[in-house]
């Protein structure tokens, strides 16, 4: 098979691949993330959820035991509560969502023998959080804020320099005036006294 044909088949497969489903939820509300992995209702899978982070790292969210055996799992998380409810098998319920919960999640189903793993991804978008609004506002006015800070620093530096210069001007003129007065004083030698010089009289014989 030629390389061009391989690239064509890969592009076709990529275009036909199903897009990752996306779930949107308002801030502070609960959300139920479905596991998009294909599964057999007759097989009691064990499910695990991970959140995909930047750099390829993964963080375990809520490990879940067999749903089909009627087990229920609940965990308190830092950014909310995570449930593994029985209403929707293998789903992940996140309570009290925040902006930190936004991201891509992946569920993995493992059969009892541990020989086959099925996985699926879902994207969660949490909107309307106060922290998110502040971040968007900062990004919108970031250039103006940076310019304002630069102007404030410039004027503070100018004021400090002016105050220091005025202080130096108020101190040093006294020394310069005294130096000028000393420069114009007459210099006299302590060993020599000034007096009238009288010529000696000579008598003619």
UniProtKB/Swiss-Prot annotation:
Expressed by activated lymphocytes, Langerhans cells and activatd dendritic cells. Disulfide bonds join 35-107. Residues 167-205 are cytoplasmic. It is a single-pass type I membrane protein. The chain crosses the membrane at residues 145-166. The keyword Manganese does not apply. Induction: Strongly up-regulated together with costimulatory molecules such as CD80 and CD86 during dendritic cell maturation. SMART domains: IG (SM00409). InterPro entries: Ig-like_dom, Ig-like_dom_sf, Ig-like_fold, Ig_sub, Ig_V-set. Residues 60-81 are annotated as: Disordered. Residues 20-114 form the Ig-like V-type domain. Glycosylated when expressed on activated dendritic cells. GO terms for biological process: CD4-positive, alpha-beta T cell differentiation; defense response; humoral immune response; negative regulation of interleukin-4 production; positive regulation of CD4-positive, alpha-beta T cell differentiation; positive regulation of interleukin-10 production; positive regulation of interleukin-2 production; signal transduction. GO terms for cellular component: external side of plasma membrane; plasma membrane. Keywords: Disulfide bond, Glycoprotein, Immunoglobulin domain, Membrane, Signal, Transmembrane, Transmembrane helix. Residues 1-19 form the signal peptide. Glycans are attached at residues 79, 96, 117. It is found in: Membrane. Monomer. Homodimer. Homotrimer. Interacts with MARCHF1; this interaction antagonizes MARCHF1-mediated MHC II and CD86 down-regulation. Transmembrane glycoprotein predominantly found on the surface of many immune cells including dendritic cells or lymphocytes that plays various roles in immune response regulation. Plays an essential role in CD4(+) T-selection, differentiation and stability by regulating the activity of the major E3 ubiquitin ligase responsible for controlling MHCII trafficking MARCHF8. Also inhibits MARCHF1 association with MHCII or CD86 to prevent their ubiquitination and subsequent degradation. In addition, acts as an important modulator of protective responses against acute infections. This is CD83 antigen. It comes from Homo sapiens (Human). The gene is CD83.
